[in-house]
Design a protein with these regions (language model features):
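Conserved loop-alpha-helix segment in the C-terminal half of the alpha/beta-hydrolase fold
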Residues: 281-307
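Active-site glycine-rich loops that stabilize anionic/oxyanionic intermediates
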Residues: 80-83
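Catalytic active-site module of serine/aspartate enzymes centered on a nucleophile-bearing elbow/loop
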Residues: 299-361
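Alpha/beta-hydrolase active-site loop
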Residues: 123-143
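Short beta-strand/loop motif that positions the catalytic acidic residue
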Residues: 273, 279-281
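Alpha/beta-hydrolase-fold enzymes
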Residues: 158, 162-247
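An N-terminal hydrophobic leader/cap segment in hydrolases
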Residues: 18-54, 60-67, 353-361
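Conserved alpha/beta-hydrolase
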Residues: 85, 92-118
Length: 361
């Protein structure tokens, strides 16, 4: 009965929005700040929005803020399911203060990006390959980072899967932070039956049996057990309450199928990730996640005991070591980049540019 009601809601929504589909599914920027939020969760200073179009995919929204001094590194954040760039504003501001330029790319069909289907709060993507293509286009076409400035991907939950898949697909990065990485389970279950249904294009856009439309009573991240912190735990829900276009409820059958396929692929091709990976969790992960961690060629892990999955939204006790680990990892890449630059200069650049010195052999 619940499934029938959910399907009926989807069909009614599609019928009502048929004449204005582009408006209903289109991208959204310039979000309104929720009045109840503390200033640390506001839009970072100098923040700017942009749109990215990749092939036939729906338009993607991204945002960027930089430091007031010369940037030391570039970080691209890949949010988890249901999050938007607004969820990460506090972290963006803190990373800016460390001297890093920070970009956030809203996922395909999520956040302020355009949607594939209606209703707008139904999570759907045909494949995580669209996330990979978006990341590669953002880096190569929009960011175009200087060769002497490290580029780091920071992916949360299933966003870590998208980040790692981009590296497997050839995106050149200097490091990847996998924050509470989440993979789909391998086991055969009722969910797998829905994944099989998701193979069909028509069925893939239907909601899962447990899907419910977004509502103000939808649990926030603290109520959902993602964080201990009542203020950070309310951030995403507050932004979605104030900005209906950001709302996302549960996933469709097709999204679950895409997640399962990406999870299997990221494990199978883990050996192609050449960049060092920092793996951050609050405790032991699923067997699938642990298998991936062990398969990565250059991966070191840090467990923050007692932390819940949304490490970037945790209370200070757990969030502080998480942030220090992220900032320290990026700083390591900055130091390495500087060391390599100095070696290159000593070997060839300086003598070639100083009159009276012979050219380097």
């Amino acid at each position: 009965m619940g499934m029938a009601r959910a399907i009926l809601a989807v069909l009614i929504s599609m019928a009502l929005c048929g004449c204005s589909r582009e408006v209903a599914t289109g991208p959204f920027a310039e979000s309104r700040t929720p009045p109840e939020l503390a200033s640390r969760f506001f839009t970072p200073e100098g923040w700017a929005w942009g749109y990215l179009k990749v092939g036939a995919q729906p338009v993607r929204r991204y945002g960027v803020a930089s430091t007031w001094r010369v940037p030391r590194a570039t970080i691209v954040i890949v949010p988890g399911y249901g999050e938007s760039a607004e969820t990460w504003f506090e972290t963006v501001g803190e990373l800016n203060a460390e001297g890093f330029t920070v970009w956030v790319l809203d996922r395909a069909g999520q956040g302020g990006s355009a949607r594939y289907t209606l209703p707008r709060d139904l999570g759907f993507t045909p494949s995580f390959d669209d996330d990979v293509a978006g990341l590669k286009a953002l880096v190569k076409v929009v960011i175009r980072p200087p060769r002497d400035r490290p580029l780091i991907l920071l992916g949360h939950a299933d966003g870590a899967v998208a980040a790692l898949r981009a590296a497997e697909a050839g995106l050149q990065v200097d490091g990847i932070v996998a924050s509470s990485p989440k993979l789909a389970p391998r086991i055969v279950s009722a969910d797998m039956a829905m994944d099989l249904a998701g193979r069909l294009p028509v069925l893939g856009r239907l909601p899962a049996t447990d899907w419910r439309p977004w509502s103000r009573s939808t649990p926030d991240d603290r109520a959902a057990g993602q964080t201990h912190d009542p203020w950070r735990g309310a951030v995403t829900h507050a932004w979605q309450t104030a900005n209906p276009d950001l709302r996302l409820s549960g996933p469709s059958l097709g999204w679950r199928r895409a997640f399962a396929a990406a999870s299997a692929a990221v494990r199978a091709e883990a050996g192609r990730v050449r960049a060092p990976v920092l793996w951050l969790t609050g405790g032991p992960g699923s067997q699938e996640a642990e298998d991936l961690r062990h398969a990565l060629p250059a991966c070191r892990s840090l467990v923050i005991p007692g932390a819940r999955p949304a490490l970037h939204l945790e209370a200070a006790t757990w969030r502080r070591p998480w942030f220090e680990a992220v900032a320290g990892f990026v700083a390591e890449k900055v130091d390495r980049s500087r060391a390599v630059k100095i070696v290159h200069q000593v070997a060839g650049d300086y003598p070639a540019r100083i009159p009276g010195f012979p050219a380097a052999p």
